[in-house]
Swiss-Prot record:
Cofactor binding, note field: Binds 1 Mg(2+) ion. Binds 2 Zn(2+) ions.
Protein name (record): Alkaline phosphatase, tissue-nonspecific isozyme
Modified residues (Phosphoserine): S110
Record-level Gene Ontology MF annotations: ADP phosphatase activity; alkaline phosphatase activity; ATP hydrolysis activity; calcium ion binding; inorganic diphosphate phosphatase activity; phosphoamidase activity; phosphoethanolamine phosphatase activity; pyridoxal phosphatase activity
Keywords associated with the record: Biomineralization, Calcium, Cell membrane, Disulfide bond, Glycoprotein, GPI-anchor, Hydrolase, Lipoprotein, Magnesium, Membrane, Metal-binding, Mitochondrion, Phosphoprotein, Signal, Zinc
Signal peptide: 1-17
Active site: S110 (phosphoserine intermediate)
Family (UniProt): Belongs to the alkaline phosphatase family.
Length: 524
């Protein structure tokens, strides 16, 4: 048994030794604060240029506690204490909070939230691209209740559009950009009930290829949902679970190819080598399906077959940026959510760090003068870290104390519920007896569940670029796409555009903006 006094003594020594010398000088903190103040004062001159490009980064399940833990991890991966590190999203000048509830759920799911931040209306949990008049699983409540997304609005305005995700391309988040479904789980017709099929509802993979036929870039997982039932997967030939699922016998990849104009350059790729061999500036349409289901966790990724999120984002921007009218790109770090559901904090946080790297890559390829970039989450998780850990403590390490009840150590990271609930001999498992630094270690939880749940608290919204100042304070989640549309002069937000101009030219003044906003029904 570890002595609590020994743990406390070690923690005290570590705390003293890990304080950087410069931080002991008050001048360091005063100078830092003064520089931050100067940066804030510069924001008084608002950037009201008309947006050419819109990039939305969605960290699925990336609540504020995940953002903070990812920040520390990023720093520690660079051999720093971690707490002082800045994520790319930390550098964005405008921050707001988003209220994530669904119309019928206090703690939301990823489908109803995706409908909110992509389509501009709140919806029921489990439904995508439809209003709250649609009931989950009830196909006959879909017709007439469809709502369109910012991706559709951008495409209708002449912009190029793209979707990049680390989940299936027909998963909850991306599907709200193009599909209208009473159930997020209708990935292919194989997952649909006979009643829904007989009533004429289409699966989400089918809708991906048919609803918005000219999406320029689609990258992620989900290969098996595009091919006929039992068709062998190109990569996992012996894996029955990787085989095609479609009961209708359709080859949606071939259908995707058939919809593309002959004079355009269209490419379907299924591995990283094929992707990186392409000249993106010579590609008009790209479909990349790199796994039968979701893509692998970043820590498990096969660098030969699976591209990283950063690589996919870079290629997507190169393809989309050829359009002089600009583009809309949705990027999802989707497996942050999966890591948390499995109680595998290390997997989740490495996914978040990789998404932050992709944010940096996108920032280096675009300009704040004409590109609005938004980073947010659909919901949070019951994930936390604490325990009075000293500065520089490994984010996956032990707290510097033991429980004053069972006298056992505990990791700083814990979950409110989930699969990490472990009882050994009638008592809480002693974490010092297991490898709590393992990639797949499941952090302890207070309540036993097979899958950890979402959290219901607000999530952060980070914004930079033209009109980013419209994201401030606390907003309903469905407000977000209205800001993007207003800034880019697309969709229904066109009244102010005649006197507005593109980046670098004269812009509508603050008074004009204040007069224009009420017509959009926007409340602050």
């Amino acid at each position: 048994m570890i002595s609590p006094f020994l743990v406390l003594a070690i923690g005290t020594c570590l705390t003293n030794s890990l304080v950087p010398e410069k931080e002991k000088d008050p001048k360091y903190w005063r100078d830092q604060a003064q520089q931050t103040l100067k940066n804030a004062l510069r924001l008084q001159k608002l950037n009201t240029n008309v947006v050419k490009n819109v990039i939305m980064f969605l960290g699925d399940g990336m609540g504020v506690s995940t953002v903070t833990a990812a920040r520390i991890l990023k720093g520690q991966l660079h051999h720093n204490p971690g707490e002082e590190t800045r994520l790319e999203m930390d550098k964005f000048p405008y921050v707001a909070l988003s209220k994530t509830y669904n119309t019928n759920a206090q703690v939301p799911d990823s489908a109803g939230t995706a409908t909110a931040y992509l389509c501009g209306v709140k919806a029921n949990e489990g439904t995508v691209g439809v209003s709250a008049a649609t009931q989950r699983t009830q196909c006959n409540t879909t017709q007439g209740n469809e709502v369109t997304s910012i991706l559709r609005w951008a495409k209708d305005s002449g912009k190029s559009v793209g979707i990049v995700t680390t989940t299936r391309v027909n998963h909850a988040t991306p599907s709200a950009a193009y599909a209208h479904s009473a159930d997020r789980d209708w990935y292919s017709d194989n997952e649909m009930p006979p009643e829904a099929l007989s009533q004429g509802c289409k699966d989400i993979a089918y809708q991906l290829m048919h609803n918005v036929r000219d999406i320029e870039v689609i990258m992620g997982g989900g290969r098996k949902y595009m091919f006929p039932k039992n068709r062998t997967d190109v990569e996992y030939e012996m894996d029955e679970k990787a085989r095609g699922t479609r009961l209708d016998g359709l080859n949606l990849v071939d259908i995707w190819k058939s919809f593309k104009p002959r004079h355009k350059h269209s490419h379907y790729v299924w591995n990283r080598t094929e992707l990186l061999t392409l000249d993106p500036y010579g590609v008009d349409y790209l479909l990349g399906l790199f796994e039968p289901g979701d893509m692998q966790y970043e820590l498990n990724r096969n660098s030969t077959t699976d591209p990283s999120l950063s690589e996919m984002v870079e290629i997507a921007i190169k393809i989309l940026s050829k359009n002089p009218k600009g583009f809309f790109l949705l990027v999802e770090g989707g497996r942050i959510d999966h890591g948390h559901h499995e109680g595998k904090a290390k997997q989740a946080l490495h996914e978040a760090v990789e998404m932050d790297q992709a944010i940096g890559r996108a920032g280096a390829m675009t300009s704040v003068e004409d590109t609005l970039t938004i980073v947010t989450a659909d919901h949070s998780h019951v994930f936390t870290f604490g325990g009075y850990t000293p500065r520089g403590n490994s984010i996956f390490g032990l707290a510097p104390m033991v429980s004053d009840t069972d006298k056992k150590p505990f990791t700083s990271i814990l979950y409110g519920n989930g699969p990490g609930y472990k009882v050994v001999g009638g008592e809480r498992e002693n974490v010092s007896m297991v490898d709590y630094a393992h990639n797949n270690y499941q952090a302890q939880s207070a309540v036993p569940l097979r899958h950890e749940t979402h959290g219901g608290e607000d999530v952060a919204v980070f914004a930079k670029g033209p009109m980013a100042h419209l994201l401030h304070g606390v907003h309903e989640q469905n407000y977000i796409p209205h800001v993007m549309a207003y800034a880019a002069c697309i969709g229904a937000n066109l009244d102010h555009c005649a006197s507005a101009s593109s980046a670098g030219g004269p812009s509508p003044g603050p008074l004009f903006l204040l007069l224009a906003l009420p017509s959009l029904g926007i409340l602050f």
